[in-house]
């Protein structure tokens, strides 16, 4: 079996947001359940809080489709007609040709940290459309697996990570993807600003926790974009608080207060 994740980055036609949500949680989920290897489908909405606030966020919504395929070359294309239903019904705003559907062969399933509360859903996710430096792929993966993945998922509110490679198997519309790899992180927090600020603080070595990230590997390319989203589908939502297997009392009360 092969784990695949397909991400659908999209915007919704004006006045059709409720129609799209109703379709996604209703008929679309029923159709997906009939596909071989289907595991889950969730939808998320872009958040005001971003770790790279100056980069464009071209998409308001992200849908994530998880599969465990026996024969990806046969089963992955079956997703295309289901995604086309939204386009055919006029639910997608692709007037600027920003819609993107990218499928990835995952290196592993979720790798969770001690922060993770397995009995609760994710509050949101972040994706990195990532690249490694040419000739240094093995070093890049080793750094992520042994250093960066574990340190990232121990940030308060961050709970799990998995990564994958852009698959040669894609569904329409097949459009440019700026990264060869997907870095997919899960959050469980009701204070994303806190999580984002402490991520940045740990990267700079100034976190009130005293925890500092290891130096960034030069095998990781700076040609990447990061996008944060909050859960926008289903019936179960994160109940509140910040998932953290540590002491939040070391953080000042105003740590996550917006500047100004």
Segments (PLM) and residue ranges:
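Macromolecular interaction modules
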Residues: 1-260
């Amino acid at each position: 079996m092969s784990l695949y994740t397909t991400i659908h980055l999209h915007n919704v036609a004006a006045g059709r947001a409720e129609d799209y949500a109703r379709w996604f949680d209703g008929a679309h989920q029923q159709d997906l359940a009939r596909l071989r290897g289907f595991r889950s489908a969730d939808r998320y909405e872009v958040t005001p809080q971003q770790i790279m606030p100056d980069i464009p966020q071209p998409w308001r919504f992200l849908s994530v489709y998880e599969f465990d395929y026996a024969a990806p070359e046969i089963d992955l294309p079956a997703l295309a007609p289901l995604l086309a239903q939204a386009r055919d019904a006029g639910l997608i705003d692709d007037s600027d040709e920003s819609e993107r559907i990218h499928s990835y062969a995952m290196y592993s399933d979720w790798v969770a940290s001690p922060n993770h509360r397995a009995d609760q859903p994710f509050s949101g996710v972040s994706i990195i459309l990532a690249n490694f430096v040419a000739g240094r792929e093995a070093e890049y993966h080793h750094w992520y697996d042994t250093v960066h993945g574990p340190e990232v998922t121990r940030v308060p509110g961050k709970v799990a990570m998995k990564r994958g490679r852009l698959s040669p198997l894609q569904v329409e519309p097949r459009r440019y993807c700026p990264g060869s790899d997907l870095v997919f992180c899960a959050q469980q927090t009701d204070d994303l600003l806190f999580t984002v600020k402490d991520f940045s603080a740990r990267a700079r070595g100034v976190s009130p926790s005293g925890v500092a990230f290891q130096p960034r590997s030069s095998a990781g390319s700076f040609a990447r974009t990061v996008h944060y989203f909050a859960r926008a589908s289903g019936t179960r939502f994160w109940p509140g608080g910040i998932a953290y297997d540590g002491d939040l009392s070391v953080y000042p009360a105003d740590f996550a207060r917006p500047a100004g």
